[in-house]
C-alpha cells in the first residue's frame, strides 16, 4: 500500500496547494511596474487590477495603456512614485537605474526584481509573484502553462537539424547576442545554434567579417518585413541566407509572450531546408 504522503495528487490539486502555501497575509494593493516586461508579468500573475502606474511603452494588455507613466529611458520619477504610495514595485534589474531603486527600498517599499536570462526563469518569476497577488492560483497556473508550452516546443523541435544562426541587432554598429540571453535560448529551443554563443559579454559588437567567418545559415532579427528586406540588402552580395523577422515586443520582452516569438521562429526555421553538405 502506498504511504499517504506519497499518494500522487492531480495537477489541479497541486497548483491549489502551492497557492495556499504561498498566499500572503495581505496581497499587494498598490503596485508600480518599471518596465514593459514586468507590466506583462503583473497582468499574467493576477496583479493587473492593482497596478497604479507603469513605465513608458507598457502597452500590453490594452488596459496598461491607460496607466500613468513614472519611468522611461530617462530615469525613474521617485517623487511621483512616493506620492502614489505603492506597497510593491516591480523592477527590471538589467534596465532600471539602481540608485533610485535603492532610495525607494530604503524607505521600506518592497521591490521585486525580474531579469530572466533563461526561459524557465520567467515561469519562476510568475510563481514568486503569487505571494503578492490577490489571485495566487492565477500566477501559478500561468507559470505551469508557460512550462508546458516550453516543453512542447522542446519536444517538437529537439530533433531538428541544427542551423547556424546569427542574431542581428542593428547594422551600424552591428550587435549580436551571446549564449547567455533569453533571445539565444529561444534560438536554441527552435533548433538553432547561435554562432556567437561563446562570447564573454552578453551583447557583443561584431564586425561584418566576423559574421562571415562563422558562416551563418539563417539570420534572425526583430521587426517587420521591411526589416527583412533591409537586412538582406545589407549582407549582399557576400551573404545570401534566409532572414527571419520576429515580433519585436514578443522577442525582446522577458514575459510569457516570448513564447509567441519562439513559436513564430520555430515554425519558420523548420521550413528552411538544411544544405546536404557544405565545404569548410
UniProtKB/Swiss-Prot annotation:
Signal peptide start-end: 1-27
PROSITE patterns, A to Z: FE_B12_PBP
Top-level taxonomic group: Bacteria
Residues flagged as site, Important for BtuC binding: 79, 209
GO cellular component terms attached to this protein's record: periplasmic space
Keyword Disulfide bond: yes
SS bond partners: 190-266
Limits of the Fe/B12 periplasmic-binding domain: 30-277
Keywords: Disulfide bond, Periplasm, Signal, Transport
Positions that bind cyanocob(III)alamin: 57
One Gene Ontology MF term: cobalamin binding
Protein role: Part of the ABC transporter complex BtuCDF involved in vitamin B12 import. Binds vitamin B12 and delivers it to the periplasmic surface of BtuC.
Assembly with partners or alone: The complex is composed of two ATP-binding proteins (BtuD), two transmembrane proteins (BtuC) and a solute-binding protein (BtuF).
Family membership noted in the UniProt record: Belongs to the BtuF family.
NCBIfam families: PRK03379.1, TroA_like
Name of the protein in its database record: Vitamin B12-binding protein
Species of origin: Yersinia pseudotuberculosis serotype O:1b (strain IP 31758)
Gene name of this polypeptide: btuF
